[in-house]
């Protein structure tokens, strides 16, 4: 059940994936982490998974998150099992009205949705979702420089240990979102209302970025659908 209180005054979960590639329509899950945080910001519970994605992990991806094909095959569980368990954990939060925070949520949730489809699993209904990537763009529209999780954590004084592990990135996402809410009153909304606002904000941000890209490439397209991209 959704709460009418500002989201940062209640419990929240944070979520991150490390995968086989950058294209969310094709990427497979390699690691996944979910962290439940109390209203006071204390870690209450953690879930972590290592999956065998069923395909080779490209060297470029392994260099980012540190999981090789060999390790995933030796230590990981079948990706269908991981996807099912991850989906159930997230769905439980959403059924209870607990917001799930994810940095660049449209990537992670699109990867998860495509994985559920590949394995004939139910896709959880992602609501409410809070995305510090979208939130930061809304309050700092003309900020120059990178908007990676690492760059924004540095800007807002958030400690990011072991970057590009799903557990560290998930918790840093929550800390970043809390820092944004502390600084910007317009982000201190109930989770459901902020979710709905982000749908429009993400679309506007994508349209602006697409306009910029089209100065050099008239055919450039930026998908502003949020929090899950449709199939192409």
Residue ranges and their predicted role:
Residues 1-30, 37-45, 67-232:
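DEDD superfamily 3′-5′ metal-dependent exonuclease/proofreading module
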Residues 45-65:
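Short, surface-exposed acidic-centric catalytic microdomains
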Residues 33, 50-53, 133:
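Residues at the C-termini of beta-strands that transition into short coil/loop
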């Amino acid at each position: 059940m959704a709460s009418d209180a500002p989201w940062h005054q209640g419990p929240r979960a944070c979520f991150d994936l490390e995968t086989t590639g950058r294209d969310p329509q094709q990427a497979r899950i390699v690691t996944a982490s979910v962290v439940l945080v109390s209203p006071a910001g204390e870690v209450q519970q953690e879930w972590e998974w290592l999956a065998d994605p069923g395909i080779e992990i490209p060297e470029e991806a392994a260099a980012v998150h540190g999981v090789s094909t060999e390790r995933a095959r030796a230590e990981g569980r079948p990706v269908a099992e991981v996807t099912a368990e991850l989906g159930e954990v997230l769905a439980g939060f959403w059924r209870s009205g607990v917001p799930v925070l994810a940095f660049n949520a449209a990537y992670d949730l699109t990867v998860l949705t495509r994985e559920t489809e590949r394995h004939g699993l139910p896709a959880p209904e992602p609501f409410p979702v809070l995305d510090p990537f979208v939130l930061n763009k809304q309050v700092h529209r003309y900020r120059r420089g990178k908007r990676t999780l690492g760059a924004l954590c540095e800007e807002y004084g958030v400690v990011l240990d072991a970057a590009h592990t799903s557990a560290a990135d998930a918790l840093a996402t929550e800390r970043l979102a809390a820092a944004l809410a502390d600084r910007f009153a317009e982000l201190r909304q109930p989770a459901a209302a902020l979710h709905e606002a982000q749908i429009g904000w993400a679309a506007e941000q994508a349209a602006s970025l697409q306009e910029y890209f089209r100065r050099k490439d008239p055919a450039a397209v930026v998908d502003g659908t949020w929090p899950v991209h449709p199939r192409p």
